[in-house]
Amino acid sequence: MQVKETVADGLKREFQVNVPAADIDAKIDEKLADLKDKVRLNGFRPGKVPTAHLKRVYGRSVAAETIDKLVRDTNDGIFSERGFRLATEPKITMPQDQKEIEDILEGKSDLTYTVAIEVVPAIELADFKSFSVEKPVVDVADSDVDEAIKRIADANRAYADKAEGAKAETGDRVTVSFKGTIDGVAFDGGTGEDIPVVIGSASFIPGFEDQLVGIAVGETRTIKVTFPANYASETLAGKPAEFETTATKLEAPQETTIDDEFAKTLGLESLDKLKEAAKARLAAEYAGASRLKVKRQLLDRLDEAHKFDAPPSLIEQEFEVMWRSINAEMQSTGKTFADENTTEDAAKEEYRKIADRRVRLGLVLSEIGEKNKIQVTDDEVSRAVIERARQMPGREKEVWDFYRSNPEALAQLRAPIYEDKVVDFILELANVTEKKVTREELYKDEDDKTAA
């Protein structure tokens, strides 16, 4: 067998491989000899079928299987001997001429093919002990706990019927039945019976709740609204609609006394236990936000410390995924690049930079994990599946069966676990200092991004 490197351009490699007909024939004979003891042919005792006869019956299919395996094994040998890590699947070009193919299958001609690959570059890892990371820490204040409990109380507020003839006000809960039309034609999902609406909750289409102010039980109004441009249903997005709406019940919010009795309605023993639960939940939220900030700092530091050319094919794959998502979002919201003060070309350039960073960081994290034998256990993946199932009550078995039969989905669960374990490994080596901050400071970056 002869292997000749024909392309060595950056991370791209291409090889021309020649496999002698004699080598292919020998492999085919090995396969036929193995087959001899397994097949049953009329007129022959088990294991006594002549090889020549087997070759006439099964020769072409065995030759095709043998060549396929031979090519895969040969390629694996080429890559491992040279220490290549492949960025993508190899591109193999086999002979196309029909007569040449026939001669190869019949053992009359050598097999010559080419294999093109893109390799992952060698990555020299930084000294993580030189990394400095600042960890924001927020103490849970009593005022934070009080605010959290007030939000819980508001969400569990009781309502009582208003007096006969009363008019709806902001904050009231109005039970309505409605029939929606667009250009006089009813549409799917436009009808509702006895639907409770809290005026001012912003849970309905913009403008719908405002037009309920002043309505009384038994009164019917025509409410005119326009579906948002980013509405989930593309057939309704941006369209004006009218809802013939009748109020069937009107209730006013009642003051909620936050005491032991209120805590018991939530399944807790006392107000003190409710405060403890609220404080623990806030502490977990703050810790999660702090973790995100620390992780961002660490990824930025890894990005700065590992500059290399990433495989173009991986960058292109990552970019295509992001660009499809951007286009889908713009179509659903009706926004244009001009609305974002940019152009399509400028946006593409920016997202290619993001794709390059993501690919490089992914390769760096993978290299760190591999060199330090960091692995995700089956138990960790199972716990992630269980957690995902808990988020879908009543469909737990469906979720479990989905992941059990879908390796790609399971890999998507495994990836963030692996990333977090690598991050934890680096943080163990890095110089991490804690800094006391306020809640507002902790969430400032997120608030700024939301505003933007």
UniProtKB/Swiss-Prot annotation:
GO terms for cellular component: cytoplasm. Involved in protein export. Acts as a chaperone by maintaining the newly synthesized protein in an open conformation. Functions as a peptidyl-prolyl cis-trans isomerase. This is Trigger factor. It catalyses: [protein]-peptidylproline (omega=180) = [protein]-peptidylproline (omega=0). The gene is tig. It is an enzyme of class 5 (isomerase). Residues 171-256 form the PPIase FKBP-type domain. Its EC number is 5.2.1.8. It is found in: Cytoplasm.
